[in-house]
Amino acid sequence: MTFFIQNFFNALQWGSFYSMIALGYCLVYGVLRLVNFAHGDIFMTSTYIAFFLVAFLSAHFAGLTGVPLFVITLVCTMALTALLGVGIEKLAYKPLRAKGANRLYVVITALMIGFILENGNLAVFGASARSFPDILAKHVWNIGPVTITSLKVLVIVSAIVIFALLQFIVQKTTLGMSMRAISYDKFAIPLMGIPVNTVITFTFALGSALAAVAGILFGMSYPVMDPYMGMIIGWKAFIAAVVGGIGDIKGAFIGGFLLGFIEIFVTAFLPSSYKDLVSFVILLVILTIKPTGFFGVAKSTKI
């Protein structure tokens, strides 16, 4: 029983990262029907941004430690990563959208942006792995034989709060209703006076900011960074979003946790080399049975 409970909490933490990243994929796809394959590398870049922000703040403000350092780093990282997402949208996606480019070209562009971010970080910062600094003091609670850390709780709570906040924004706010309206008919929406480009810009900013939250928490939890760290976790988060039902916020959230649970419990019972194989086979079976994912809805498209 202890073994199960301990791995249950480990799976919650690991699934939280997948969920937070998957929500970013879901947000952009839900509005534009665009899979932003660079999202995993935006997550990676946010970790580097947080790393250098901590170094800068620690060097220039020696008394800044603990929670204040974490909050300032988090807010600044979210803002800078949001600017990165907006810049990518303005420079890469918006021109293609204005020209009515085929979706294949948009997908290729997204992949190229990811490669640029990876190799740009590689060229500037080198291939050597960097160790993410300790920002918050880690508290360990032993509940019987089960060990839970304060960081683990922070990660899980952050994922839940982000999900709830995103649901509120999309379902209850005027901007969220505009986002949903664009997903239904982006050509008719300008006739209703809704500023399409402004809504799209906000969508990319919000999705990138979510990646930043995941990035800084991931760096604190697994403090080894490299330029390619976002590639695999980004692809897995995308698959989790698809399994949950791409474009559905609840589906992306649950899909991330599902993948986290599969990976942790496969590793608990089998050699770690089987983790990806078994995980992807299970996810493939799920998609074979229900191609739209758990919460996705089949839609007809006129061609």
Q: Where on the chain are the PLM-derived regions?
A:
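Inter-helical junctions in multi-pass inner-membrane proteins, predominant
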Residues: 2-17, 169-174, 203-241, 266-274
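Single transmembrane alpha-helix segments in multi-pass membrane proteins
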Residues: 4-53, 91-101, 105, 245-249
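Helix-loop-helix "hairpin" substructures at the membrane interface of multi-pass membrane proteins
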Residues: 14, 147-225, 249-255
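Short loop segments and helix-boundary regions at transmembrane helix junctions
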Residues: 31-35, 83-128, 169-172, 232, ...
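Membrane-embedded helix boundary and interhelical linker motif in transport proteins
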Residues: 39-87
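Hydrophobic alpha-helical transmembrane segments of polytopic membrane proteins
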Residues: 81, 236-259, 282-287, 294
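Cytosolic-side transmembrane-helix boundaries in multi-pass membrane proteins
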Residues: 109, 187-191, 195-198, 270-303
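Extracellular/periplasmic helix-loop junction at the C-terminal end of a transmembrane helix
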Residues: 115-143, 268-275, 295-303
